């Protein structure tokens, strides 16, 4: 038996996982990462931890994450959950701080880096994902619940904001 399920939003609003109950194997897609940055440009950051709880409730023994090595021991499964939760929580909490301080996007990026870089700066695709991650986290922390669609104009707006003068 193979189950295709939506257990809640996280990486996107409509994340789907594949669960093989007889083998206790979970294909999590980008809801979980291992040794790689989480791409959160289209995420529901506030809701993501509850979705991780729903995944954990399945009690998977092996997880195939969206990026990174397969998690095939109890320790690596626990570590994958902790890592993803920490990435998402650190990102959102630092963005909330930046919004509370009324920082512009460039300043918010610098602030988020002070929290994110020491923990995650070494992982795969971190530098690629971070501008999109911080932009979405600042949006969500500012009250924009649903991600804005990434258009060419929005992409330009983001890069302009990140390069703007302080």
Pin down the residues of each PLM region:
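C-terminal regulatory/interaction regions
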Residues: 100-166
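Acidic, low-complexity intrinsically disordered regions
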Residues: 44, 79-82, 146, 155
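Catalytic core of the metallo-beta-lactamase
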Residues: 1-50, 57
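Short, well-ordered beta-strand elements within core beta-sheets of diverse protein domains
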Residues: 36-40, 97, 138
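Divalent-metal (often Zn2+) His-rich catalytic cores of metallo-beta-lactamase-fold enzymes
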Residues: 47-107, 111
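Alpha-helix capping and helix-loop boundary segments enriched in small/acidic/polar residues
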Residues: 39, 79-83, 125
């Amino acid at each position: 038996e193979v189950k295709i399920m939506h257990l809640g939003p996280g990486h996107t609003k409509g994340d789907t996982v594949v669960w093989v109950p007889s083998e206790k194997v979970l294909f999590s897609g980008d809801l979980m990462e291992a040794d790689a940055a989480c791409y959160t440009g289209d995420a529901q950051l506030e809701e993501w931890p509850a979705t991780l709880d729903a995944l954990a409730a399945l009690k998977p023994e092996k997880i195939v994450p969206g990026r990174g090595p397969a998690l095939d021991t109890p320790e690596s499964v626990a570590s994958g959950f902790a890592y993803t939760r920490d990435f998402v929580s650190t990102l959102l909490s630092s963005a909330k701080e930046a919004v509370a301080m009324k920082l512009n996007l460039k300043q918010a990026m610098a602030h988020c880096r002070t929290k994110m870089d020491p923990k995650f700066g070494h992982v795969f695709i971190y530098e690629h994902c971070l501008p999109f991650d911080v932009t979405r986290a600042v949006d969500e922390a500012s009250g924009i619940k649903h991600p804005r669609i990434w258009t060419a104009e929005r992409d330009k707006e983001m890069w302009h904001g990140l390069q703007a003068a302080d």
